From Swiss-Prot:
GO terms for biological process: hydrogen peroxide catabolic process; response to hydrogen peroxide. It catalyses: 2 H2O2 = O2 + 2 H2O. It is an enzyme of class 1 (oxidoreductase). This is Catalase-3. The gene is CAT3. InterPro entries: Catalase, Catalase_AS, Catalase_clade1/3, Catalase_core, Catalase_haem_BS, Catalase_immune_responsive, Catalase_sf.
Length: 492
């Protein structure tokens, strides 16, 4: 299977300059004018084409994850999990699958520093024999909110103020004061790991709960974990200021230079699995994206390794036009009823169609490398050559048939239509356990970051009190420390 199938030939294999249509250009230095100093003529098509193309070079940046870096490599199965899934690319140890990865910051713009305190995106596109599989995650195992209905408001709160275009703590703390479920995510973001040293030295997570299905149709819930073999490293606040002040693209450069030097970064893939019949044994909802699954109860199981051994050839084609979507899965992997995942299934593809056009999956970085066929025709920027006469189904003139049926999770659903919260929220236990697992100096840095955020002059007494109450419910001493620094009295 050729991972570079559908890649257009180079546009620069001519010995001389040409227009986009291939006509030779004998002068690329001067515009066509009336005399040496006269006005430029509109008939200078080369000038018009050159400027028009330049004016349209930029496309809409991603609404989140705008700043990113990509690399290519392979995934190799090291442990047999065929009893859990019928996915072809996981069929046996030794099987290799080409892939491309995009690491990113989340909130800030395309040219922002890579040293800001921000989650990091960790998205992997597997080019399998059964189509692409996009595992679209982050460097933290949890998320801010559990229901995708809140996602647009969440991003608005984290993004800069629409009036001043300045990111401000009072907006963030105001919004999340209504969402105590966010505490677990903030226990990562305001922790030392909130600023990874670079992309090679951070772990990754699928974040959402998916489902694995084996050949017999047996389904289990699954969480995906990427563990870096380089070791997890982070930047403390003063280090981030120093590194960011000297190179705002330090993580991109580190990734590129390491691969170019032959120091290929590697991650081990692990999974946690849970039989849906046993989910009531947990004190939280396993489909709640703000929770981690305890590894002492649901241990990590090794699956394989990912090696990045090739840099991208073109940043625009393989980073800006690279598009991921959690809806893109393969037989043997399926969704769950995770509320955030369910909304991501729609939203990601929708934003790619806005950003890149309806035929974004025809772009070389996004197209499958296996044979594929459907009747999705035409549209803006369609460049697939098709010469068939039958563009409907079914037809006795077209031999293409249905694929072999693949197992999907069997389930029976019942209930009334309603908008409601999940039953087992349990918002405070896991962030408290995480805080208590740290040494005292790490705890103190966490407290200091929260004190700095809550010291924003526009943060009201009410909002400060709410956050102290939340952190007190997670850990009484933590709430007391934050309150003491702010000269407030905890309510719990």
């Amino acid at each position: 299977m050729d991972p570079y199938k559908n890649r257009p030939s180079s546009a620069f294999n001519s010995p001389f300059w040409t227009t986009n249509s291939g006509a030779p250009i004998w002068n690329n230095n001067s515009s066509l004018t009336v005399g040496s100093r006269g006005p430029i003529l509109l008939e200078d098509y080369h000038l018009v084409e050159k400027l028009a193309n330049f004016d349209r070079e930029r496309i809409p940046e991603r609404v989140v994850h705008a700043r990113g870096a990509s690399a290519k490599g392979f995934f190799e199965v090291t442990h047999d999990i065929s009893h859990l899934t019928c996915a072809d690319f996981l069929r046996a140890p030794g099987v290799q699958t080409p892939l491309i990865v995009r690491f990113s910051t989340v909130i800030h713009e395309r040219g922002s520093p890579e040293t800001l305190r921000d989650p990091r995106g960790f998205a992997v596109k597997f080019y399998t024999r059964e189509g692409n599989f996009d595992l679209v995650g982050n460097n933290f195992p949890v998320f801010f909110v559990r229901d995708g209905l809140k996602f647009p408001d969440m991003v608005h709160a984290l993004k800069p103020n629409p009036k001043s275009h300045i990111q401000e703590n009072w907006r963030i703390l105001d919004f999340f004061s209504h969402h105590p479920e966010s505490l677990h995510m903030f226990s990562f973001l305001f922790d030392d790991v909130g600023i990874p040293q670079d992309y090679r030295h951070m772990d990754g997570f699928g974040v959402n709960t998916y489902t694995l299905i084996n050949k017999a149709g047996k389904a289990v819930y699954v969480k995906f974990h990427w563990k870096t073999t380089c070791g997890e490293k982070c930047l403390l606040d003063d280090e981030a200021i120093r590194v960011g002040g000297s190179n705002h693209s330090h993580a991109t450069q580190d990734l590129y230079d390491s691969i170019a030097a032959g120091n290929y970064p590697e991650w081990k893939l692990y999974i946690q699995t849970l039989d849906p019949e046993n989910e009531d044994r947990l004190d939280f909802d396993p489909l709640d994206v703000t929770k981690t699954w305890p590894e002492d109860v649901l241990p990590l199981q090794p699956v394989g390794r990912m090696v990045l051994n090739k840099n991208i050839d073109n940043f625009f084609a393989e980073n800006e036009q690279l598009a991921f979507c959690p809806a893109i899965i393969v037989p043997g992997v399926y969704y769950s009823d995770d509320k955030l995942l369910q909304t991501r299934i729609f939203s990601y593809a929708d934003t790619q169609r806005h950003r890149l056009g309806p035929n974004y999956l025809q772009l070389p970085a996004n197209s499958p490398k296996c044979a594929h066929h459907n009747n999705h025709h035409d549209g803006f920027m369609n460049f697939m050559h098709r010469d068939e006469e039958v563009n409907y189904f079914p037809s006795r003139y077209d031999p293409v048939r249905h694929a072999e049926r693949v197992p999907v999770p069997p389930r029976t659903l019942g209930g009334k239509r309603e908008k409601c919260m999940i039953e087992k929220e349990n918002n405070f236990k896991q962030p408290g356990e995480r805080y208590r697992s740290w040494p005292s100096d790490r705890q103190e840095r966490f407290v200091r970051r929260w004190v700095d955020a809550l010291s924003d002059p526009r943060v009201t007494h009410e909002i400060r009190s709410i956050w102290i109450s939340y952190w007190s419910q997670a850990d009484r001493s933590l709430g007391q420390k934050i309150a003491s620094h702010l000269n407030l009295k905890p309510s719990i």
